[in-house]
Amino acid sequence: MQQAITQQEKAQPKSVLPNRPEEVWSYIKALETRTVPVDNNPASVEQNMRLTEEQRQVLIQIERDQKAADEARKLAEQQRIEDATRTQSKTTEDMKNTEAEIVKSESIKKQDSQKIESAKKVEQIKTVNNVRDSKKFGLQCGAFKNRAQAENLQGRLQMTGLNAQIQTNGEWNRVRVASFDTRELAVQAQSRAKTVTDCVVIGM
């Protein structure tokens, strides 16, 4: 039984692949070796290739797609250039605005500094004027240990119309004429006192 099956298998012919269709193979081979010109003239394509209507439509669609891709690429490049130009213009404008803000800030600081300096000067002038207004002047006409001598000089000065006073400090009795708002008034009184004695102008 086993020998019969083996003989039957040997009797069957080996499997042979069918021959490839000659017509289809020739068409594919022709397409593989054929140079396909792609230009803008469908008539040229038809003349050189002798394509079927379906193949011609495919090639025309490829050309259209390529044109559309080129146009899209050109538009993208143009848009990129415009964006770069706008960005550069905005950057330049921002720099100008920043410089203007800096100049404005420096100007404001300078004005504030000038105002502060002016206020300081005014305050200094007021202080000087206040010091001048608060300072009094007088005459020192003599200093005596003897009270009677001081009173004698006081009386003679009063006779000239001066407000002579005696100020006692320890053992000294000082005869002074006071007080005057300005140094000029004290100098005038000094001239009047010369008929009695020499006095010196002092601050009080």
From Swiss-Prot:
Residues 1-10 have a biased composition (Polar residues). To E.coli FtsN repeat regions. Residues 1-20, 70-99 are annotated as: Disordered. This is Uncharacterized protein HI_0896. One of its GO terms (molecular function) is peptidoglycan binding. Residues 131-204 form the SPOR domain. It comes from the Bacteria. PROSITE patterns: SPOR (PS51724). InterPro entries: Cell_div_SPOR-domain, SPOR-like_dom, SPOR-like_sf.
